[in-house]
Amino acid sequence: MIMNPKIHNKILKNLAKLKKKVFTKYAAYDFNFAYDKNGNVYLVGVDNVTNQTFNLIKPVFKFLKKPLPAELYGMDQQPFYFVNNHHYIDALNSDTGEQELLRYNVIDQSLVNAQTNDLVDPAFYTDLEGYELDLSQYTGSLLDLSNEVISVEQQPVEQEVNLTPEQVEEAEQVEQQPVDQQQVQQVDPNLNEQPVEGDNQNFTQQYYDQQLGYADQNVDYGYDPQQYTQEQDYVDNTQQYDQVQDYVDPNQQYYDDQQQYDQQGYDQGYDQQYDQQGYDQQGYDQGYDQQYDQQYYDDQQQYDEQPDQQVKAVVEQVVDEVVEEQQPVEVAKPAPTKPVGPKPQPGKKATKYVIKKPEPKPKVVKEEPIEPAVEKEEVVTVVEQVVDQPVQVAEVQPEPVVVADDEIKLASEQPVKKKINLDDLQQIPVVIKLPKFETPKLPEPKADSEQKEEIAVKVVEQPVENPQVQETKHHHALPKVKIEKRQEVELVPSKLDDHYDLIEEEDDFFVDKFKFEDIKLSDLLVEQKPIEVNQPVQQPVVLEQSTPSVQAQPQSVEPKLEITKLEELVEIKTDNTESLNKLETLIDENKKIIDQFKQLKEEAKKSNSNINLEKVAKQLVDYLTNKLNEKTAALNKPEPSTVELNKVEQAKQKAVEKLVHEQVVFQPREKVVQQPKEVVAKPYFEESDDLLTSVSNKPKQPTSELLDFLVQQVVDGEEDDLPPPTNFDKWPNQNVRQKLDEINQVEAQRFNQTQFVPPQSLNQVETPNQRLFLEPEIQVQPQALYTASREHEQVQPKAQHQQPTTRIEREEVVNKFQREPLVSPNRLAYHSNKEFDDLYQNHYEQRTARINPQDSYYDQGYEQPDPYQEQQPYPQEQYLDPRYQQQVDPRYQKETYQEYNRPFPPNQEYDYYPPAYESRRDYQPYQPRRVNYEVRKPLAYEFSKQPAPRRYQQLPNRYNESDQSRQLAYPVHKGTLRTEADFLRFREGYGYDYDRPSTQYYRSNYDTYVREVRRPIRQLGMIEPVAEFRSRTLAPRRVARPTYGLRRVSRIPSLAPRGYNQQPRVRRVPVSRGYW
């Protein structure tokens, strides 16, 4: 079907207005555009109740005020049938829980409450089962001409058609010409030329009806070679080529014609060219065909390419001859402006090519007044058919419905297990209540509704007699269910559907009830103050005031004091320069004390008494730190008077003098090691990073037991089980006691001075004085825990943190072989130019157009994400943890069968080059053997990991298999890849190697011509069930028991799946010899 071009263009021009008009005026109906054989447009409405179609009251064009013709065509050029654009949906309002009737309009996709006509949001409604509304299932008629609209804008119409009233009348007469469908169908569309008289080549069959676009076989036109040039001016370039055409103007050729490429985009040109019907039928490019074969046009083609050029034909002649001589094919031509082609020559009108002639019809149809009557007759016949059908159905239906009743009856009795006799059935009174099943009465097909009522009557009256029927017709139980649903729906009490929220519920505690009259306007108004200019300036000031309080906090924290060397008297290392300055001031204040100390030292030299100066110094340092604490505390307090300060200083000086005096005078010279006082065991803290930075770990106080024990070790070193200490260098004259004393230098805590107490963590661990083995009172230091738990980071612990020991610590071997770290998943594709471009982007001019990475046409195989690689590789300890290991699947054999039938993607054969997302790496012929083992740790002290791993982990880490740490030598299916299975293949001297062709045992013809060596793929028998990693869940209470014994090699074969092949199953490895 080809629409009359005038009307078609007019529709397309006014399409927006038309749609708007139709929506506003006829929203109650469903409607669509349609046109008849002659290309006249109708606006077809349908009544949603009766499904009756009609021409809408004010049609699109004024001259079309008639009833609808019998044969209509849709905009998709198919026979027109009406699809509802409005669908009625029963839905539940998810707020109120009430059932409502909604109307869905497919065209503008709006949802309306059918009772109130309010627009409604589908998100707040569910269907009767409680699921979301699925509006995609409702389809509508084709109203969308948007494609054609675009094409009209690209091909601007040059002259707009304004029909004069005479032309309109003329067109109406033509439209009322009958259409003979039979003759239309007989035409061969590929029939381009038929010689009318065999010897005369001037006769062609190319003349066609201007509207319908098929060859007119009853009218034969003579070919007058003069008429192209004289009447039609066909060779006149201005007329033929200046309109917007799809082919190239032969005068302009390709170069001058910028219009075709500039004005419309490149692809649009192609769309127009290939969308048209004429092009689809013949495969060649018709623009060129016209240039080279211009003597023999196909008129059909010329017409398709010049849709806007108006054509004049002598209408009267054609009509007269058609009616008198024989009935022509439908002639429905608009009033044209130019004649189409050569005038028909009456002499040639022999009946040579007539295919079929309808008998009586044409003479009747020629007269105008009879035409509506004919159409009405057709409508009536359709109704008769509709009436016939329900009568037949009525005869068949009553039996199944009876059966449904029968089944209701029996279902109630099923719990009784006796065999049911007919007599029992008759004794039990049968009461069947069926709801009244009223269908809305449709006005036109009356017989249908009457018949349904009769059926309902029959159902109730039929007695239940033969139970045998139940068995045969059992599937008719379905109507029963529907009826029950209908009942439930009707039982919903009417008070619930309160669409306007008029009813107040009495027990609504949550909403404060108020009247609208109580709301004052002043409550709703916002106070409007002028904006202050200063505001933005004030905000930062507030921030500045708050900052010093933050800075003041670290000042209260004590600096750590560490004694580095004792040669210089007191050198103090501090964290902050501030605290250092304070300390200097403190020392200046206490110079007198230091002077006194020097005097004492000199006195000691004179009297030859052994003063343990180091201990004195330590006590002094303790005193100074205590002093510093007081100083910092005093900074926050109001300053005391100078008199008080002097008193305090004097007291302190006396204390120091007394201390030093005790040291020198009252110390008996035999006791080199002072008797330790009992000290309460300090709490130590479980390791956590922030605490360890702030706590300085001091070694424990030595006890007499400890010292005796160590001395004992030194004395009988050879006899003892433990290895003797090895690190005694030759020292200057000192006895053993002094050496030990130096090894275990410990801060003497003389006074209970107020020392800085670090903030206590919640998980504080109190260690009782327990004796581990033979080592009395040696408790594990938090520092040791810290280093033990972090051994895999090769951080050398500082000397001051180490526990006192008698052996040289072996240097930790730095791991030479460390696995390549996991490359982050967003690494570049190996053919991407990114690094290159980043380096050189300013240094060279880019000569090629860059492909837009968003362009879906170009990104085929390259930047695709890998289906197997996780977005983030799993954290290591999670991957190793045995609790999260997935159980081996007991349905193992079934899996193997699936594996065997797996559809391989087509590129498997070329899988040996690295996939696109992976960077290239150098070829490693084998994996280095594993050198380093985890250092042994005592399990008792491992707090960080709950399930303690094995002491020695023999196997290499199973890290993420999708990250290949080397280039594999053969194509691999990632799902199948097992690293452990390959252990020989990549060792030097075994297996396949690219570099040594002697290794390649099996070669095929493929290998000799294509250099790439083909190897056997991973075979079925090698596949073991791979336990895939499962992301972390809660640990199960116990490990599930494996389904089969640990070391069982084969499974007991089951009988069933072994089809025609009766040999017993044996697990063996099928080896391919290199041919795939």
From Swiss-Prot:
Keywords: Cell membrane, Cell projection, Coiled coil, Cytadherence, Membrane, Virulence. One of its GO terms (biological process) is adhesion of symbiont to microvasculature. The keyword Coiled coil applies. Residues 797-806 have a biased composition (Polar residues). Residues 562-616 form a coiled coil. Residues 336-345 have a biased composition (Pro residues). Residues 326-335, 862-873 have a biased composition (Low complexity). GO terms for cellular component: attachment organelle membrane; cell projection; plasma membrane. Residues 326-351, 789-808, 850-873 are annotated as: Disordered. It is found in: Cell projection, Attachment organelle membrane. This is Cytadherence high molecular weight protein 3. It comes from Mycoplasmoides gallisepticum (strain R(low / passage 15 / clone 2)). The lineage of its organism: Bacteria, Bacillati, Mycoplasmatota, Mycoplasmoidales, Mycoplasmoidaceae. The gene is hlp3.
